[in-house]
Amino acid sequence: MGRSYEKSKQAFEEAQHLMPGGVNSPVRAFKSVNTDPIFMERGKGAKIYDIDGNEYIDYVLSWGPLILGHTNDRVVESIQRVAEKGTSFGASTLVENELAKLVSERVPSIEVIRMVSSGTEATMSALRLARGFTGRNKIVKFEGCYHGHGDSLLIKAGSGVATLGLPDSPGVPEGTASNTITVPYNDLESIQVAFQEFGDDIAGVIVEPVAGNMGVVPPQDGFLQGLRDITEQYGALLIFDEVMTGFRVDYHCAQGYFGVTPDLTCLGKVIGGGLPVGAYGGRADIMRQIAPSGPIYQAGTLSGNPLAMTAGLETLKQLTPESYEEFRRKGDRLEEGISNAAKTHGIPLTFNRAGSMIGFFFTDEEVINYDIAKNADLALFAEFYKEMADHGIFLPPSQFEGLFLSTAHTDEDIEYTIETVEKVFQKLRR
C-alpha cells in the first residue's frame, strides 16, 4: 500500500534506550507479530493517526476503554471543564458520588463501591478483601485469564487438572504463588476437584466472565452459574473481573447479560472514559470491611480523582440499551463478513463474540480455553496483522487480545474492514 513507518521506527529506536523494551506495557512492543511498534499521534471517532500520518480504523480503542471512540466531544468537554477547576485534591468530590450511584443503578450487585486507579489495583484489593472477609488464604483463578500484574495472579497451572500455582514471572515468591490454584477455563469438573481438595481454605474464585486475554472466549452454558453454586456451597466468594467486560458486554455488564450475580466485581477501562481508573464493589456486608469502616486496609493518592470520574460518568451517560443493540448488529455483520471470507479462501477460522468484544482464531477448532487458543496459527495471525495495518486497519498486535467496537464505528467502517479482510485472505491463501 506504500505506507511509510519511518518516523515510528526512529521513535522506537530512541525509546529502547529510555524504557524497558522501548515501551511502558509489553504488548505495545508488537513482538507477537514480529514487527516494529507503531507510534500514534491522535484519534477522532473510530479513526487513529500515527506519527507518519497514516490513518487507521481502530479496533484496539486503547485496549477497550474508548467505547465511544476517540476524543468524544462531550467527554473531552467534561474533562476540560473539570481540569480548569483542579485536577486532584486529595479530598472527596461530588462526582465520585455521582459515578458510584450510576454504577450501582446499572449493576445491582454493586451495593458499595471503592474507586482505585487501575484494574490491577482493583483485583489485588478484591483478593485481599476476600481473604480478610473469609479468613482463608487460597484463591482460584483460570488458566489464560489475566487479572493484572499482582503477584498472586501472575500464576500458571502445573500439569494436573487442579494444581497449586507456580510463578509465571521472575520476582513472584513461590510462597505467594502456592496460595493460587489455577484450573482450565470453562471446566467445572476441575473446579470441583479444587474445592474437594482445598475447599476449607479457598477464599474466593476470580474469573473473567468473558475471557479477554487468551483472545475472546465466552463462558459455556452453565459455567458461570456452576461457579456461583460451588462457591456458595463452600462459603467462598465469587469475584467477577469485569475490568474488560464491564459496560462492554452489556448495559448491565457481563453479569447482567448472563444472569449470574457475583459477590464482588472489579471494574476499569470503560468507567474511566480513557483515563486511568479501576474500581471494586459488591455486597455491602463485605465492602464495609474495608478501611475506614472496617479493618482491611486499602488506599490510593489518586483514587477517585475528578478527571477520571468525570470522564467515566460522561461515558456511561451516553451509553443506552440501544447502544448495545447497535454493537450486536455491527458485530453480526463483521462475523458474517469475516467468516464468509475465510470460507471462500480456505482460511481456518473460529469467530468468538460477546457484546462489543470480538475475537477470531486461525483454527477450525472451537476455542473454549487457553490450551486450544494456544494452538491457533500464530504465524498466520502475524502475517494477517501486518497486511491489515498496511491497508489501514489497526488490530491488537497479538492473537491473544480481543477487538473492540465503539459507538463511533460506522457501517462504512465495518464494510471497509470486511472488504480488506477479503483482500488479505486472498493474498494469504495457501
From Swiss-Prot:
Query: What is its EC class?
Result: isomerase
Q: Which CDD domains match?
A: OAT_like (cd00610)
- GO molecular function terms attached to this record: glutamate-1-semialdehyde 2,1-aminomutase activity; pyridoxal phosphate binding; transaminase activity
For this entry, list what GO says about its biological process. protoporphyrinogen IX biosynthetic process
What InterPro entries does the database record attribute to this sequence?
Answer: 4pyrrol_synth_GluAld_NH2Trfase (IPR004639), Aminotrans_3 (IPR005814), Aminotrans_3_PPA_site (IPR049704), PyrdxlP-dep_Trfase (IPR015424), PyrdxlP-dep_Trfase_major (IPR015421), PyrdxlP-dep_Trfase_small (IPR015422)
Q: Pfam family of this protein, just one?
A: Aminotran_3
Provide the reaction this enzyme catalyses: (S)-4-amino-5-oxopentanoate = 5-aminolevulinate
Which cofactors is this protein said to need? pyridoxal 5'-phosphate
Signal peptide position in this chain?
A: none
Which Gene Ontology cellular component terms are annotated?
cytoplasm
The EC number of this protein is 5.4.3.8
N6-(pyridoxal phosphate)lysine modification sites are: K269
Listed A to Z, the keywords are:
Cytoplasm, Isomerase, Porphyrin biosynthesis, Pyridoxal phosphate
User: What pathway is this protein said to act in by its record?
Assistant: Porphyrin-containing compound metabolism; protoporphyrin-IX biosynthesis; 5-aminolevulinate from L-glutamyl-tRNA(Glu): step 2/2
Q: Where in the cell is it found?
A: Cytoplasm
Record note on quaternary structure:
Homodimer.
Would you identify the family this protein belongs to, as annotated?
Answer: Belongs to the class-III pyridoxal-phosphate-dependent aminotransferase family. HemL subfamily.
Q: What is this protein called?
A: Glutamate-1-semialdehyde 2,1-aminomutase 2
